[in-house]
Amino acid sequence: MDLVVGRVVKAHGISGEVVVEIRTDDPEARFAPGAVLRGRPRSGAEREYTIESVRAHGGRLLVRLAGVADRNGADELRGTVFLVDTAELPAIDDPDEFYDHELEGMRVVTVDDAPVGKVAEVLHTAGGEILAVKADEGGREILVPFVGAIVTSVSRQNATIVIDPPEGLLDLA
């Protein structure tokens, strides 16, 4: 299974750098100079890219890739996602930490065992992580902050997330 670790947002400057939105908790290792990443463009075939240089830029990364020498080449990469195979990921020892792909697809229920839906996606925002839950009824999207005050437990074994939603949270959609 593939896991997205970054996405090209746009070109930066005229020398071929791209702005990359980080989707990994280990960008120093994933985007280190010399690292090779698989890239999947919005259209076209996957290919490998070698990182030549990287620097921080306002919560994102400015990345120079081998073979991308100008703005036109960088513009062609807009929307490209960088991928790793989940089998290559190190195991997580902390029972309270999760990879996004582990949470996606899990069943969400309230502390009273009332069904809410399934996690469709984990959103990474400036305010923290949010679970985008597709509701069982009507298929609407419910956004649940992934914080201890709301998410009371996560069971990998049962593929279930238990939430204690504040009043009105499940009505917002």
Curated annotation (Swiss-Prot):
User: Which segments constitute the PRC barrel domain?
Assistant: 95-169
Q: Which InterPro entries does the record associate with it?
A: PRC-brl_dom, PRC_barrel-like_sf, RimM, RimM_N, RimM_N_sf, Transl_B-barrel_sf
Would the keyword Zinc-finger be found if you checked this record's keyword annotation?
Answer: no
Checking SUPFAM superfamilies in the record gives: PRC-barrel domain, Translation proteins
Q: What is its main location?
A: cytoplasm
Domain of life from the UniProt record: Bacteria
What Gene Ontology biological process does one annotation of this record name?
rRNA processing
Give GO MF terms, alphabetically: ribosome binding
- Gene Ontology cellular component list: cytoplasm; ribosome
State its location(s). Cytoplasm
State the UniProt keywords alphabetically: Chaperone, Cytoplasm, Ribosome biogenesis, rRNA processing
Q: What is known of its domains?
A: The PRC barrel domain binds ribosomal protein uS19.
Q: Which family does it belong to?
A: Belongs to the RimM family.
Q: Mind telling me which PANTHER family this protein's record contains?
A: RIBOSOME MATURATION FACTOR RIMM
Listed under subunit, the entry gives: Binds ribosomal protein uS19.
Protein's recorded name:
Ribosome maturation factor RimM
Q: Give the originating organism.
A: Mycolicibacterium smegmatis (strain ATCC 700084 / mc(2)155)
* Classification of source organism: Bacteria, Bacillati, Actinomycetota, Actinomycetes, Mycobacteriales
